[in-house]
């Protein structure tokens, strides 16, 4: 199971210290929400933040591009040290070129889907990606209420993975707390993006540990294969950063 704290919920004036704190709390992933004010109504930050934070941590940088023109950000984020980029299936004909462009830059690729979008739009791409990211709120702002009607999307993604003998991760993002993490785990999720659900707790370390235990307990397969390509990538990122002076 992967518990990925979302930097969007951290103190914007202390990103460097917050990143170090997240890693010390036991997180292997850091989720970076990139919003352009067009695809979603909010604006967050850009690749310079990732570049600044990269030398401070061994964590896997999972970048979520909520942008109308993600193609202009792929190379800057690759150079900044992103390990995976999530693009939106709602971009239609742009999706396949974006997948291949991201791969050519050495990044893993996730495909995100918004709550109102039909899950079937993901199916043509399931053999091309490393992760499916099921948005469980309408993207753009942190701290929203979990949309329970998104649970069947998680179940479908889980069924497709088994039916097609694939190995993509199934992530959930939005309104993820201890209770909703359990619901998502029962539906088949194995990667949990959580902002206020983690940062709002007294102890971030205890919160990450508790959410991971809840997810593991409720998941139908008891977790996920540690030999999954992204699990291997996380280990590789940690090893590479550990070897740096």
Please place each PLM-identified region on the residue numbering.
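Conserved N-terminal beta1-alpha1 strand-loop-helix module at the mouth
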Residues: 1-86, 91-94, 101, 109, ...
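Short glycine-rich anion-binding loops that position phosphate/pyrophosphate groups of nucleotides
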Residues: 137-139
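Post-transcriptional modification and biogenesis factors for structured RNAs
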Residues: 99-114, 124-128, 149-170, 174, ...
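Alpha/beta catalytic cores of nucleotide-metabolism and tRNA/nucleoside-modifying enzymes
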Residues: 166-172, 177-181, 185-245
């Amino acid at each position: 199971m992967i518990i990925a704290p979302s930097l969007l919920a951290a103190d914007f004036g202390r990103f460097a210290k917050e990143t170090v704190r997240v890693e010390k709390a036991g997180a292997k992933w850091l989720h970076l929400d990139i919003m352009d004010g067009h695809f979603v109504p909010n604006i967050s930050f850009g690749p310079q933040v990732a570049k600044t934070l990269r030398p401070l941590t061994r964590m896997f940088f999972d970048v979520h591009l909520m942008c109308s023109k993600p193609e202009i950000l792929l190379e800057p984020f690759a150079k900044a040290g992103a390990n995976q980029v999530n693009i939106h299936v709602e971009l239609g004909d742009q999706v396949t070129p974006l997948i291949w462009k991201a791969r050519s830059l050495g990044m893993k690729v996730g495909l995100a889907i918004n709550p109102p979008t039909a899950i079937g739009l993901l199916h043509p791409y399931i053999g091309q990606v490393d992760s499916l990211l099921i948005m469980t709120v309408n993207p753009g702002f942190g701290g929203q209420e979990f949309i329970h009607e998104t649970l069947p999307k998680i179940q479908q993604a889980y069924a497709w993975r088994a039916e097609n003998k694939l190995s993509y991760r199934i992530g959930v993002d939005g309104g993820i707390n201890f209770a909703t993490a359990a619901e998502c785990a029962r539906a088949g999720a194995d990667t949990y993006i959580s902002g206020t659900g983690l940062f709002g707790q007294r102890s971030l370390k205890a919160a990450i540990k508790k959410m991971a235990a809840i997810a593991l307990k409720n998941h139908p397969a008891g977790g996920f294969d540690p030999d999954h390509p992204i699990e291997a990538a996380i280990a590789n990122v940690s090893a590479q950063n550990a070897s740096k002076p």
